[in-house]
Amino acid sequence: MNCYFEEGEVFTWIRDRERSGENMVVSLKMLKECHRTGSKQAMIAEDIRTGKKYFVKVLFCNDLEQVYVEKESKVQLYSPYIIRIYGGMLDEKNKRFITLVEYIEESDLSELMRGRGIAGDTWNEKMKVRNRIAMKFLLGIDHYMSMYRQDPIVHRDLKPENVLASPDGSVVKIIDFDWVHLHASNVTVMLRREQKGTPGYA
């Protein structure tokens, strides 16, 4: 039986120095569950000390070889257009991999492109915001491709639902880098034995 987090539960998330190169210890209180399937869970959590919010993403895996963490390196997706992944923690007792991710309160691109929640009182104003969002999205793609040209990182599930944007288009970030495909041998990577991703996008 999977050990899911419950709302109100307190958990200490630790990124191991041996695996990541630096320590990070955060005492978290689970606030709200966002998503749950048989093998995955996503929670909104709060740092008890600072009040800062995070997304906590959990992958349950019976075969821990499926999650491979190479000690001397890590994935660092630092970009203003990509949601930040702070790192992962391997909980061997409960057979789960726990990822700490930047939290932002924005709508996904599919909702905004349908005109739901997008800023602007007139059609022209809304179109300007849509164009601004589209431009920032393209800039984000170009930015991360140029950053990782030497060690390419392929998203594999890029779709409107995996892009968050503010109603006025001032913030646009690509999300869901939990399952990235990396063409490199010296990086931190979670390996998948079977094909993942959304059909039509992956």
Predicted regions and their residues:
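Juxta-kinase regulatory segment immediately upstream of eukaryotic protein kinase catalytic domains
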Residues: M1-V25
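ATP-binding glycine-rich loop module of kinase domains
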Residues: S39-V67
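Short beta-strand micro-motifs within the conserved protein kinase catalytic domain, predominantly
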Residues: R84-F97
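Conserved short submotifs of the Hanks-type protein kinase catalytic core
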Residues: N94-D108
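Structural motif in protein kinase domains
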Residues: I104-I118
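Activation segment of protein kinase catalytic domains, centered on the conserved DFG
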Residues: R116-K136
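Catalytic-loop of the protein kinase fold
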Residues: M145-S166
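Activation segment/activation loop of eukaryotic-type protein kinase catalytic domains
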Residues: S166-G197
